[in-house]
Amino acid sequence: MPEVIIVKDQDEAGELYARCVADLIKGKPDAVLGLATGSSPLAAYRHLAAMVKAEDIDVSKVRGFALDEYIGLPLTHPESYHSTIHRTVVEPLGLDPEKVHVPGDVLDGAPLEDGERIAHAGPEYDAAIEAAGGIDVQILGIGT
């Protein structure tokens, strides 16, 4: 049975998650992280960035895959999940941007009418995750 840990607030939950991820990266330098956007994981990302810096954790081989992306929104748009992940995770942690992906990598602003391209995006993304060895740990949010 999984262990259930009750914490007092979102910040403490973020710190606990960050510790688990930091320990994972120390033991598996090429860890594959499943990344989420939104407000729920921000404390975790903030604590993880602090741990990476304070403990001099090498993140040069860490890979990441975001949960989702908007269809029809260019990756460079400030509200895209690509931009959000880079702003909240890649830059603060010092991850290699070439090793962090969103489903939209293969779409990059494709219009909704581009059904064939969109239809191939999911299987291509799944194949990229599989080629990376699967997700080692996934962060999710439940909304606030």
Kindly label every feature range from the protein language model.
Residues 27-54:
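Glycine-rich N-terminal segment of FAD-binding domains in flavoprotein oxidoreductases
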Residues 1-33, 100, 119, 124:
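N-terminal glycine-/serine-/threonine-rich phosphate-binding loop
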Residues 39-40, 70, 142-144:
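Short glycine-rich anion-binding loops that position phosphate/pyrophosphate groups of nucleotides
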Residues 18-26, 49, 53, 86-90, ...:
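Generic structural signal for well-ordered alpha-helical scaffold segments
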Residues 35, 138-140:
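Redox-cofactor binding/interface segments in oxidoreductases and associated redox assembly factors
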Residues 1, 57-137:
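Ligand-binding beta-strand-loop-alpha-helix segment within the catalytic cores
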